[in-house]
Amino acid sequence: MAPLRLFWIWLLVVGTRGVKDGDMRLADGGSANQGRVEIYYNGQWGTVCENMWDLTDASVVCRALGFQNATEALGGAAFGPGYGPIMLDEVRCTGTEPSLANCSSLGWMRSNCRHDKDASVICTNETRGVYTLDLSGELPAALEQIFESQKGCDLFITVKVREEDEIAMCAHKLILSTNPEAHGLWKEPGSRVTMEVDAECVPVVKDFIRYLYSRRIDVSLSSVKCLHKLASAYQAKQLQSYCGHLFAILIPQDPSFWTPLELYAYALATRDPVLEEICVQFLAWNFGALTQAEAWPSVPPALLQGLLSRTELVVPSELVLLLAVDKWSQERRTSHKEVEALVGQVRFPMMPPQDLFSLQFNLSLYWSHEALFQKKILQALEFHTVPFELLAQYWGLNLTEGTYQPRLYTSPTWSQSVMSSSYNPSRSFQTPQHPSFLFHDSSVSWSFVYLPTLQSCWNYGFSCSSDDPPLLALSKSSYSKSNPTIGYENRALLHCEGSFVVDVIDFKGWKALVPSALATNSSRSTSLFPCPSGVFSRFQVVIRPFYLTNSTDMD
């Protein structure tokens, strides 16, 4: 009967309910049913902007505070301006939400309002007649205490580690039986369970069992892989899904690149294509930084082969890429066949003639693979000196192949950046018209600007809709000489603090809409790898010219 007695003790545990994200209050109204709307988020209170504020939104606030409805939705800081951040802007509720945090909006702290536009409400004096005392917030801690006590158990767990001592702990069947997440651990009738665990995951086993009691767990960069592995092994589907979601959030937190490489190996071992693609995408977008990291020589040949096959590979230049492959092969002592496969993925036509000439002096691989390099250099020099119409006509070259397409080159030749916090987030710059040496005397002038608000669109002379900002604008100077055989597929790189690239976006015409840096209730998409700060630190445009092979000039 001891487990049953402990279970009833757990049900009787009480405590105080703390403030949590999304909680609301009314301030400076003089009475309980009116005031300036304030909402809690990330450890502080803030206000709500009046943009799109209406009676439906106000009623969500009133009902959450125990009143029947709202009678007025006020703007213009009707009860005085507030303090702190403007938490929400352009709130759009359906009326059934428990908090403004659950309504559509621009997202947390993504507003350009001032406090003279703080939203307020007046609620009906009548309350709903129902009052709730909610002490359930203390239940997880109470359940954890029962597990930590290791008393009154009726389920005995043995944790087996390969060729090492076993670890013993115990649990309570009654509590575990209430949680579907625990059913995979305790499948068969009986009082004993054996868990087989890798040595690296032993430190989180106790956390995993504790989670089956409390249904809450802290997941970090160091624990996410093992918790995902345990959740997968014991069918804790919700924890497994949660850890899978966290991979993209946690990977950018490791500047050493060991974590994405480790998770890539784990994805292959568990045949998880989603995790595999997340790791490969992060490494591709941060390839230049990867080549400078201590982990660079540890990149597996198959992974490097896959990375080099990608056009959306972020690197200063193709020469930098080839030199990095050269260094990688020296440190790994790669086989002749593996080197040739990797060199075959290098886009020699994207290197200018002077770089091609320097390879014989700066590349250790050159003389051990001389025939291959001479073939590739000749192919590149033909690209640089022969009009593409003749290449297509006489050699049958397909100039849409990856070999003839630029990657995401971040050197000043093809790229320019603006800081999101800059007072004047705009740049004017020039690039070559095309990578081919045939165009070395022709340049194109560009203007690149970050437009965080509708007002900034108007200030820079752009026509934006209200749904566009924040966005990036890229325009080509009308004075730049046009060539009907050349097109552009330009991209914008979104950098998080620490300069990791967390997303790459396309330009549709002159504009590229900037996604949210963090997941919000906004209808706007979120960057693939979120920024913990909630803002992108830098935007970098990359110019990518290519031949229009179906141009009428070919006829």
Curated annotation (Swiss-Prot):
Domain BTB, residue spans: 153-221
A cellular component annotation (GO) from this entry: extracellular space
Gene: LGALS3BP
Alphabetical keyword list: Cell adhesion, Disulfide bond, Extracellular matrix, Glycoprotein, Secreted, Signal
Glycosylation site residues: N69, N125, N362, N398, N550
N-terminal signal peptide: 1-18
Record's subcellular location: Secreted; Secreted, Extracellular space, Extracellular matrix
Quaternary structure, from the entry: Homodimers and homomultimers. The multimers form ring-like structures with a diameter of 30-40 nm. Binds LGALS1 and LGALS3. Binds ITGB1, COL4A1, COL5A1, COL6A1, FN1 and NID. Interacts with the gamma-tubulin ring complex (gamma-TuRC), composed of gamma-tubulin, TUBGCP2, TUBGCP3, TUBGCP4, TUBGCP5 and TUBGCP6. The unglycosylated form interacts with PDE4DIP; this interaction, which is PDE4DIP isoform-specific, may connect a pericentrosomal complex, made of AKAP9, CDK5RAP2, EB1/MAPRE1 and PDE4DIP, to the gamma-tubulin ring complex (gamma-TuRC) to promote microtubule assembly and acetylation.
Protein name: Galectin-3-binding protein
Protein source organism: Bos taurus
Domain SRCR: 24-124
Function noted in UniProt: Promotes integrin-mediated cell adhesion. May stimulate host defense against viruses and tumor cells.
Disulfide bond entries: C49-C113, C62-C123, C93-C103
Domain BACK: start-end pairs: 260-360
InterPro entries in UniProt: BACK, BTB-POZ/Galectin-3-binding, BTB/POZ_dom, SKP1/BTB/POZ_sf, SRCR, SRCR-like_dom_sf
PANTHER family, per database record: GALECTIN-3-BINDING PROTEIN (PTHR24410:SF16), HL07962P-RELATED (PTHR24410)
